[in-house]
A protein has these predicted regions:
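Short, acidic/turn-prone active-site loops that include or flank metal/cofactor-
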Residues: 7-10, 61
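A contiguous pocket-lining binding segment that forms or flanks enzyme active sites
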Residues: 31-33, 46
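Active-site-adjacent beta->alpha loops and helix N-cap segments on the catalytic face
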Residues: 10-22
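Short, small-residue-biased leader/transition segments that mark boundaries at the very start
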Residues: 2-4
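Short glycine/serine/threonine/alanine-rich loop segments
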Residues: 27-28, 53
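Flexible C-terminal active-site loop/helix
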Residues: 38-126
Length: 126
């Protein structure tokens, strides 16, 4: 069995670790949902290194998928994939540096993700 959950939806790294503890007591492995680029990836790598039942990490490292998410001009990350896995960085914090000057001079484009509803009207993930 596998628990696939998103740190953003569950309340952050601390709450994710609590979910992992509950899952571990039921012999369920963790596979973090990782859809949001290099900052989310860095947090996921550190989370994976901190829980004993971490199994896999969803990632967007293919050239067809990354769509600029891993642009070194915007975010410098010490996390690089090696032999189909990430090595945990010894850099402080999450091991990333955000180029704030680049972002200040960039144009912001608002985007709202689709909000899907089930037949009964309840909200669901997309």
């Amino acid at each position: 069995q596998m628990c696939i959950r998103d740190r953003c939806n569950v309340g952050g790294i601390t709450e994710s670790m609590k979910v992992a503890g509950w899952c571990e007591s039921h012999y369920i492995d963790m596979m973090p949902h990782n859809p949001l680029g290099p900052i989310c990836t860095a947090a996921s790598i550190h989370y994976g290194a901190s829980v004993p039942n971490f199994a896999w990490l969803e990632t967007r490292e293919s050239s067809a998928e990354n769509a600029g998410f891993f642009d070194d001009e915007i975010i410098q990350s010490s996390h690089k994939m090696q032999n189909a896995m990430y090595v945990v960085s010894d850099e402080p914090g999450l091991g990333i540096k955000v180029n704030e000057d680049y972002l200040k001079n960039s144009k912001f484009k608002q985007w709202d993700p689709p909000q899907l509803e089930r037949n009964d009207g309840s909200v669901t993930n997309w």
